Amino acid sequence: MYSFEFVKAKTVAEAVKALKREDAQALGGGQTLIPTLRSRLASPSALVSLNGIAEMIGVCVTDDGMLAIGGATPHAVVAKEAKKHYPALAALAGNIGDPAVRSRGTIGGSLANNDPAACYPSAV
């Protein structure tokens, strides 16, 4: 790999500020981005870690009955927490990859990658 700055954002505001840098990339679970970096198919100037931003993790039902899922929520959490309200989404999340991928990969990363063969982009 090559040199880049690593930014560990603690809040959404910090992440947004860091991502305004030229060629900065958001890093969640890294299931797609890390192999892309290793293959030298991307060369961001900075990686902005979204891990640990509490407001980006979790699943809840809003006052108007909508399911809200934070972008940094791992697939395994989506599978567990969405089961009561959206069983099809929970089943989809529970069958992504293997347990290691489900515990590390995130719904936001999957949607941001927008691979047409991936599960979430076709479901949402």
PLM regions and their residue ranges:
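C-terminal structural segment of proteins
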Residues: 1-124
